[in-house]
């Protein structure tokens, strides 16, 4: 498979056939697929990465923040 980089939210939603790529990413992490989560995050463009952090802090339970944030750096 070709590596995917610098993808927008819309591109990722289409590619993975999901309505909300950020929800999909969080669910992937919560299901224990940590490596897959990291790959999904790295595929996002810079602006989408910022939007993901906003989503994380506003829509995801705080108990998950620390571990998910560690995976983004």
Locations of the language-model features?
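Short amphipathic alpha-helical interaction elements located at domain edges
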Residues: 1-73
């Amino acid at each position: 498979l070709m590596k995917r980089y610098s993808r927008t939210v819309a591109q990722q939603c289409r590619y993975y056939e999901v309505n909300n790529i950020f929800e999909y990413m969080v669910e992937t992490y919560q299901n224990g697929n940590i490596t897959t989560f990291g790959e999904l995050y790295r595929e996002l463009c810079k602006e989408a990465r910022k939007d993901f952090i906003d989503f994380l802090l506003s829509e995801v339970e705080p108990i998950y923040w620390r571990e998910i944030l560690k995976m983004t750096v």
